[in-house]
Amino acid sequence: NSWGVPDGPMFQAVLDWIDERPEQPFFALAYTIETHHPYVAEPPLVEFQTKDEKHQRYLNAVRNADQQIAWLMEQLAARGLADDTLVVITADHGESFGQHNQTVHSFSVYESAVHVPLVMLHPALKNVPQRRIEQVRQQVDLPYTLVSLLGCRPPDAWQGQDLFAAEDRRAYFFSTGNNVACGIREGQYKYHFYIDSGHEELFDVLADPGELKNLATEQPQRCDEYRRRWGGLIQYQPGFLRRHGA
């Protein structure tokens, strides 16, 4: 891979590092890289077949990463570490394969590029009812939640909230591609505003997860409110304003 080593040797290196200090607490970040372009799984794996060769390679690379994570969990259990280790599986972005004429992930705020998985594994979570969190959450909530699960109080200055809290919340986001896109996700609605072109999009992502029906002209007041909120936020970004004439 152009970014690093295959996932198998990477996980083995993580375990070797853990084995060097068996009595010490540890924090390890394992960055699976086979799912990054050009999506090459090692060893080669073909469990999924699609008409799009790149998409097929990607799906099989994800499957291989899944198998490597399962192997890691088995190795932690064999070392007696499974009951003392909080494992988090997530991602820094999604990946697009033609949705909205977009590929990869760098220049889009559509769900295919920004929706990521989040799985947490630890025996202490047995007291937390297993459930799928349907409300809006952000990665900024993850450190806050992990520290709370470990029995510590997050610093007051930290942003984020407990992932398991019941209330819904609002998420702001943006992408600095050729046409900068800002957005807000609140409940079922997701709003996109393209700074350079002024184009707006509003989607009901529960009824329309593929973001195919733009509701902006049908709900102008909602768009006005979301644009106003973003305007208040970017006032704290003077360089951003100068660059885009906002």
Region locations from a protein language model:
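Solvent-exposed soluble domains appended to multi-pass membrane proteins
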Residues: 1-246
